[in-house]
């Protein structure tokens, strides 16, 4: 399975404390209409940390049902509890997801050997394509390129990484050690174009919740060799990328989507609404970009 191009890390819309299935299905449709290359339910942007297990499963199921095979679905299924990660990954496979996005265990801060054994154990229970998610700013642990290379060698299910350090030296080492067939996706919207330039294959994006066509255009232009267009789009969406991180993700992106009329603005604690000053800044940025 090739996960290439622009994938959106979908928000999970809520209404009155429950998953808003109608708005979620509409978001999936809009993303596909806008030319997105793939979708990721139940990632960080989807507030997976505050979904119940049943909601987590429901969101994956709804996404797969609505996509109907038109684009790949890479389902968030990670946990810092290996047994729980096995359960969620098994459900993702049963629901028909094309692959699983598995975050490195967080809070318990395993060693590199512990990280290796975690993913090996999941693969032994649920053989399906995995993209490992490395985001040290949230997990407190960095998955080293050498460990990824060992996983790639020993665990066939590990076919790539979502690399969110923003560190192009580390990205380059991953590609050097793992080879060109290892799928390296940006987990940092600011460095999509540089990551593609050193051999990456795409992005799992927050910003593409708001500008799916632009993020898809950036990736497509790069792969078609149209570097001028890729560079132009990179700078066109720079202000959007900054806006999506005015406060902790997914607070700004859900606020933006509510301003666009696509979802109700509802977050789950401990996420709280965007500060008023940042709401004004966000609206100004979206207005300048012609989005609202």
Curated annotation (Swiss-Prot):
GO terms for cellular component: cytosol. It holds the Pfam family DHDPS. Pyruvate binds at residues 45, 204. One of its GO terms (biological process) is diaminopimelate biosynthetic process. Pathway: Amino-acid biosynthesis; L-lysine biosynthesis via DAP pathway; (S)-tetrahydrodipicolinate from L-aspartate: step 3/4. The active site is at 133 (proton donor/acceptor), 162 (schiff-base intermediate with substrate). It is found in: Cytoplasm. Catalyzes the condensation of (S)-aspartate-beta-semialdehyde [(S)-ASA] and pyruvate to 4-hydroxy-tetrahydrodipicolinate (HTPA). Keywords: Amino-acid biosynthesis, Cytoplasm, Diaminopimelate biosynthesis, Lyase, Lysine biosynthesis, Schiff base. The record marks 44, 107 as: Part of a proton relay during catalysis. It catalyses: L-aspartate 4-semialdehyde + pyruvate = (2S,4S)-4-hydroxy-2,3,4,5-tetrahydrodipicolinate + H2O + H(+). It is an enzyme of class 4 (lyase). Belongs to the DapA family. The lineage of its organism: Bacteria, Pseudomonadati, Thermodesulfobacteriota, Desulfovibrionia, Desulfovibrionales. Its EC number is 4.3.3.7. Homotetramer; dimer of dimers. This is 4-hydroxy-tetrahydrodipicolinate synthase.
